[in-house]
């Protein structure tokens, strides 16, 4: 794969997360009845970063949970069949019933991972609402799923791959588009 372009650098990611944190606070009139749930792997770290920013702004901690969704196939490459994401587990340290749950992921693409996450959340409890925050929306939805909070819209072709790198996992913060050779 060849790197085509860097879309967000460390500073741009920080700015996007700060803006999303402010949007969440404004939309929810504070964050008292909200729980952030990150989709493994990078969504968890983004959720934790958002919780830190919200706490800095509001002065109150935000509960952060995580959900592990594994794909039977590589959802970022060509589709080979109707295989679906598989929920491997959820670690949510609070009851989500009657809470606003904000699912956090790095890239929104087909929408299948988010749908699997929503199914898993409804199995755990009955949230009053489920919202979605993503760092990157690259389009190409296969399901009627739309993010409530978006760091950056990046129109891509299906042949391109959007890669999010976060310092907690990848030792650097960057979002880049790669082209398959």
UniProtKB/Swiss-Prot annotation:
> What Pfam families has UniProt attached to this entry?
Pribosyltran
Give the matching InterPro entries. Answer: PRibTrfase_dom, PRTase-like, PyrR, PyrR_bifunctional
Task: Map motif PRPP-binding onto the chain.
Answer: 101-113
Principal EC category: transferase
- Key words, A-Z: Glycosyltransferase, RNA-binding, Transcription, Transcription regulation, Transcription termination, Transferase
Q: Which is a GO BP term held by this UniProt record?
A: DNA-templated transcription termination
Q: What is its EC number?
A: 2.4.2.9
Record field: catalytic activity = UMP + diphosphate = 5-phospho-alpha-D-ribose 1-diphosphate + uracil
Q: Which residues form a coiled coil?
A: none
Q: Output one GO MF annotation.
A: RNA binding
Q: What does this protein do?
A: Regulates transcriptional attenuation of the pyrimidine nucleotide (pyr) operon by binding in a uridine-dependent manner to specific sites on pyr mRNA. This disrupts an antiterminator hairpin in the RNA and favors formation of a downstream transcription terminator, leading to a reduced expression of downstream genes.
Q: How does it assemble?
A: Homodimer and homohexamer; in equilibrium.
Belongs to which family? Belongs to the purine/pyrimidine phosphoribosyltransferase family. PyrR subfamily.
User: HAMAP family, from UniProt?
Assistant: PyrR (MF_01219)
Q: What is this protein called?
A: Bifunctional protein PyrR
